[in-house]
UniProtKB/Swiss-Prot annotation:
Family matches, as PANTHER family: PEPTIDE CHAIN RELEASE FACTOR RF3
Function: Increases the formation of ribosomal termination complexes and stimulates activities of RF-1 and RF-2. It binds guanine nucleotides and has strong preference for UGA stop codons. It may interact directly with the ribosome. The stimulation of RF-1 and RF-2 is significantly reduced by GTP and GDP, but not by GMP.
Record-annotated tr-type G domain positions: 11-279
Compartments, as annotated in UniProt: Cytoplasm
Organism of derivation: Psychromonas ingrahamii (strain DSM 17664 / CCUG 51855 / 37)
Protein keywords: Cytoplasm, GTP-binding, Nucleotide-binding, Protein biosynthesis
Pfam families per the UniProt record, alphabetical: EF-G_D2, GTP_EFTU, RF3_C
Protein name: Peptide chain release factor 3
Length: 528
């Protein structure tokens, strides 16, 4: 019998991530979501503001310098009668692996699209990842106070490229300098735009009913076009259907401007009303329901040095079932050990607080002294392994070299920790002492060198290396595997978790190897 306490808390929670192409305004909307949830008294805007007030969710040194969110932040705040867990994901394409994994820890996503640009490359890639679990998607068309594309075209593009039906919930009145507000199709209300900058939320004027004669004087140049346009839109677009939304087949669409603090609260209203409460999770052994009395959770991310004053690493855990209580004993399934966790933390973008309890849907941080890895499962006793937390094959490679050869030990330690954290992947060729670093984008290489220097006092540089790809190898036939390991020895390497990978200098070489060894599987992803 599930306790009333767990039932009530699961009912209240909504856990979601914000996904977008870089510069679509994702970090700004994160700020404003927190502002409307009263979690921030003063929302810091991102990049180029003279006030020295940095966005609250960007907190590693390099992020402060560049104005991009490199690591995933977790923020919890109350909104109406719900408790919202928001995971801010890196928008910069170079940090996509982290983002992919974060999407395994949420129950819904808010997709932010720049209304001037429409669907962009990174959004397409992220939507592919959400498709793996049919995650429900809410869409926010941002920057309506700038010159934008036609809203009908934007929705058509989302439907055509992302293969998801669009149901408009709010509709823009004018665009750019002529942006006057939005019309809420479900409530039949016109909400007039008044810009609020930073942490000011302006009182908005709401006029009930599209036929209200008051609109003739308030919107003399727009009301006629708006009524005509809406007639067409309502006739041609999809109605909101909650079932289809929960299956990831239809997205409610909102318009607004995050920088002007306008339209964000409507999205939040939709999110807390429609997004699913914490969902069940597939483990290898069985499906885990959130309302179980027994505790379970999995690690989807490890982050080093979140607090410059403490040289520590935090493992981020999604609670899947049961209840975490301070001091409880947990079974760390991979190591087989029972551990007592008394110092778990919750986050408010860089400000961490010790937590007494956590429920399904919550994200808690465990202090990690090198024993926890991405994909690890913790339970209150049962041997479970949650499925589907992927590692993706890197696309770019460099050899890393020390400026001071005596620091080899520190270099290895630093690289291993950074690879466990998922910041980068490390491969150690069997035939040499080289260290090959693999990443999904160039910026990751910069981050690694910078963090090796600031956190491990190691000066390192990169050298070019001819590697086309690195794929994990496995086989059901031990004899064939042994033969392969012997013959392909020069091309084999161990990754940070000691899994065997094939390092292909060219794609031609890889294709030949795949033909020559049909019993060996070459894999682009590896589950943690």
């Amino acid at each position: 019998m599930t306790s009333k306490d767990i039932i009530e808390n699961v009912e209240k929670r909504r856990t979601f991530a914000i996904i977008s192409h870089p510069d679509a305004g994702k970090t700004t909307i994160t700020e404003k979501v927190l502002l409307f949830g009263n979690a921030l008294q003063k929302a810091g805007t991102v990049k180029g503001k003279k006030s020295g007030q940095h966005a609250k969710s960007d907190w590693m040194e390099m992020e402060k310098d560049r104005g991009i969110s490199i690591t995933t932040s977790v923020m919890q705040f109350p909104y109406k009668d719900r408790l919202v867990n928001l995971l801010d994901t890196p928008g910069h394409e170079d940090f996509s692996e982290d983002t992919y994994r974060t999407l395994t820890a949420v129950d819904s996503c808010l997709m932010v699209i720049d209304a001037a640009k429409g669907v962009e490359q990174r959004t397409i890639k992220l939507m592919e990842v959400t498709r793996l679990r049919d995650t429900p998607i809410i869409t926010f068309m941002n920057k309506c106070d700038r010159e934008t594309r036609d809203p009908v075209d934007l929705m058509d593009e989302v439907e055509a490229i992302l293969n998801i039906a669009c149901a408009p919930i709010t509709w823009p009145i004018g665009m750019g300098k002529e942006f006057k507000g939005i019309y809420d199709l479900l409530r039949d209300e016109v909400i007039l735009y008044s810009s609020g900058q930073g942490h000011t939320i302006q009182e908005v004027r709401i006029i009930k009913g599209l036929d209200n004669p008051e609109l003739e004087s308030v919107l003399p140049n727009h009301i006629h076009d708006l009524r005509e346009e809406l007639e067409l839109v309502v006739g041609a677009s999809h109605q909101f259907d909650h079932e289809l939304f929960l299956k990831g087949q239809l997205t409610p669409v909102y318009f607004g401007t995050a920088l002007g603090n306008f339209g964000v609260d409507h999205v939040l209203d939709g999110l807390v009303e429609w997004a699913p409460k914490p969902l069940s999770r597939a483990a290898k052994q069985r499906v885990v329901e959130p309302l179980e009395d027994v505790f379970s959770g999995f690690i989807f991310k490890i982050q080093a040095n979140m607090d410059p004053r403490h040289r520590d690493r935090i493992a981020f855990m999604r609670v899947c079932a049961g209840k975490y209580e301070k001091g409880m004993k947990m079974h760390h399934v991979r190591t087989g050990k029972m551990v007592s966790i008394s110092d778990a933390v919750t986050f408010m973008a860089g400000d961490r607080t010790a937590t007494e309890e956590a429920y399904p849907g919550d994200i808690i941080g465990l202090h990690n002294h090198g024993t926890i890895q991405i994909g690890d499962t913790f339970t209150s006793g049962e041997t479970l392994k949650f499925a589907g937390i992927p590692n993706f094959a890197p696309e770019m490679f460099r050899r890393i070299r020390l400026l001071d050869p005596l620091k080899q030990k520190q270099l290895l330690k630093g690289l291993m920790q950074l690879s466990e954290e998922g910041a980068v992947q490390v491969f150690r060729p069997l035939r040499s002492n080289d260290l090959i670093v693999g990443a999904v984008g160039v910026l990751q290489f910069e981050v690694v060198v910078q963090r090796l220097k600031s956190e491990y006092k190691v000066d390192a540089i990169y050298e070019a290396i001819s590697v086309a790809t690195a794929l994990w190898v496995e086989s059901d036939n031990p004899l064939k595997m042994a033969e392969f390991e012997k013959k392909a020895y020069d091309n084999l390497a161990l990754d940070g978790s000691n899994n065997l990978a094939y390092i292909a200098p060219t794609m031609v070489n890889l294709n030949l190897a795949m033909e020559r060894y049909p019993d060996i599987r070459f894999r682009k992803t590896r589950e943690h």
